[in-house]
Structures are given as structure tokens and as C-alpha cells.
Amino acid sequence: MPKKTIYFGAGWFTDRQNKAYKEAMEALKENPTIDLENSYVPLDNQYKGIRVDEHPEYLHDKVWATATYNNDLNGIKTNDIMLGVYIPDEEDVGLGMELGYALSQGKYVLLVIPDEDYGKPINLMSWGVSDNVIKMSQLKDFNFNKPRFDFYEGAVY
């Protein structure tokens, strides 16, 4: 079975974001249509391997920031699909930028929302750039070889 690569967009700044991040990664490991090994996960590809969750002082380093930003853009351009882990009550502005950039590059954009948050209102712009919005529990079985458009069942704000 063919496999697709993804750009894994997800916040990791709060406990809820970290929980959703881990749940999504576990689901992707089980998904037979994803080539996770060759996909781009920003937290695993920060410049010179310096993770700002462990070394926040690098958030003030222009070389680190510029290189990490450009690597992330390359990750979006060179992977098949943009996947965004989205928490309606904790929107991450960086994810919003990544979603818009992916759309500009002609990428299929999939938002994944934790089941307990699915149906809550989401940002109009995040909704607008998304080709589909699914529950976290659907991620392990989502067929990335046959991406389709569908409407989000919740409202927008």
C-alpha cells in the first residue's frame, strides 16, 4: 500500500496541546497510509537539534529562529499533506500560519481535533483553509491515499 508523508503541525506549549500531540503521533504510528519516518515533525527538526522546549533561551536567537522557520517551510513544501492538530480553545498562531502556507503550496490540509473538543467553534481562517476536519479517534483509520473534502460539523468564529 502506498504511503504519504505529512507535515505534522501541532502546538506543544500547554498540557492540553502536549496530550493532543502525543495522541496524534500514536494514531499516526498505527495508520498504514502514513510514512511517518520520512514525514516532517517540526519539534524533531529544530536547527542544530536545539529544542526550545528544553532550551527556551534560543527563542531569542535570530540564527536559530531563522533556520528553524525556513526548515519548517521546507517541511511543508516537501511533504504530501499538511496535518494540523487543533484545539479550539487553545489556538496556536504558528499552526495558523503553517495551515495558510500549506494552502498556498497546494497541499491537502487536514485538521485533527481531540474528540472532546470536536464540534466546538473554530477560527474562520483555520476552517477556511482546511479540506477536512476529523476527530482524533478517526486519525488512525484515515486513508491519506484518498483525501477528500468534507465540512466541519461545528461553527466558526
Curated annotation (Swiss-Prot):
It comes from the Bacteria. One of its GO terms (biological process) is nucleotide salvage. Optimum pH is 6.0. It is an enzyme of class 2 (transferase). The active site is at 98 (nucleophile). Keywords: Nucleotide metabolism, Transferase. Its EC number is 2.4.2.6. GO terms for molecular function: nucleoside deoxyribosyltransferase activity. SUPFAM superfamilies: N-(deoxy)ribosyltransferase-like (SSF52309). Pathway: Nucleotide metabolism; nucleotide salvage pathway. It catalyses: 2-deoxy-D-ribosyl-base(1) + base(2) = 2-deoxy-D-ribosyl-base(2) + base(1). Coiled coil: none annotated. Belongs to the nucleoside deoxyribosyltransferase family. Catalyzes the cleavage of the glycosidic bond of 2'-deoxyribonucleosides and the transfer of the deoxyribosyl moiety to an acceptor purine or pyrimidine base. Homohexamer. This is Nucleoside deoxyribosyltransferase. It comes from Lactobacillus leichmannii. The gene is ntd.
